[in-house]
Amino acid sequence: MKFFIDTANLDQIREANDMGVLDGVTTNPSLMAKEGISGKDNCMRHYLAICEIVDGDVSAEVIATDYEGMIREGEELAALHPQIVVKVPCTAEGIKAIKYFSDKGIRTNCTLIFTVGQALLAAKAGASYVSPFVGRLDDIASDGIKLVENIVAMFGFYRYETEVLAASIRHTQHIIQCLEAGADVATCPLNAIKGLLKHPLTDSGLKAFLEDHRRVNEGK
């Protein structure tokens, strides 16, 4: 399973990339706003800065909600850098735009997926990725992980090449569950990725090793 980091914060992207396990980045308008980035030119420069840090795919979202606007913005984003994947919402206009982009060889990430039916339409339109939102479904007492499982099974049965990019990951357990569900990618906040390292037995074992090493050296 690939790891993407879900942020527009350059320091966090660098930290995750320095771990040597980062495969890509996902952003959205909310994450860009959180970093105080506004205006088309500033957003474009920021996407380029992200592409300079990582080697993998970088999802950049269109703001327009109409077909023509999505096409215009998506083509501009795709022309910015080869790593850019155009992020498009799962709406009627969005599915139409994904089909256009697919025909033009422009890669897309269909976002805001909450049903298998939405994922099916995105895959048929030629999306490179679909992003089921695990945490947001859990928030309304639905089962986000089950959705991931069902999409993975459906894509496998019908042999769609679209990758399942599990999004809205809230914690480390979500990552493990997405792995077990067969997701191709999990896009996560930095603290969730780092959380995979944590276990009390690892901490206590390392402490014991270091203490034994100290005693050996003192014995010399």
From Swiss-Prot:
GO biological process: carbohydrate metabolic process; pentose-phosphate shunt
Catalytic activity: D-sedoheptulose 7-phosphate + D-glyceraldehyde 3-phosphate = D-erythrose 4-phosphate + beta-D-fructose 6-phosphate
Catalytic site positions: K87 (schiff-base intermediate with substrate)
PROSITE patterns from the UniProt entry: TRANSALDOLASE_1, TRANSALDOLASE_2
Predominant cellular place of this UniProt entry's protein: cytoplasm
Keywords associated with the record: Cytoplasm, Pentose shunt, Schiff base, Transferase
SUPFAM superfamilies to which the protein is assigned, alphabetical: Aldolase
Pfam families for the chain: TAL_FSA
InterPro entries: Aldolase_TIM, TAL/FSA, Transaldolase_3B, Transaldolase_3B/F6P_aldolase, Transaldolase_AS, TSA/FSA_arc/bac
Assigned EC number: 2.2.1.2
Pathway named in the protein's UniProt entry: Carbohydrate degradation; pentose phosphate pathway; D-glyceraldehyde 3-phosphate and beta-D-fructose 6-phosphate from D-ribose 5-phosphate and D-xylulose 5-phosphate (non-oxidative stage): step 2/3
Gene3D superfamilies on file: Aldolase class I
CDD domains: Transaldolase_FSA
Disulfide topology: none
Molecular function per GO: aldehyde-lyase activity; transaldolase activity
UniProt KW Cytoplasm keyword: yes
Subcellular location: Cytoplasm
One GO cellular component term noted in the UniProt record for this chain: cytoplasm
Family: Belongs to the transaldolase family. Type 3B subfamily.
Function description: Transaldolase is important for the balance of metabolites in the pentose-phosphate pathway.
Name this polypeptide is given: Probable transaldolase
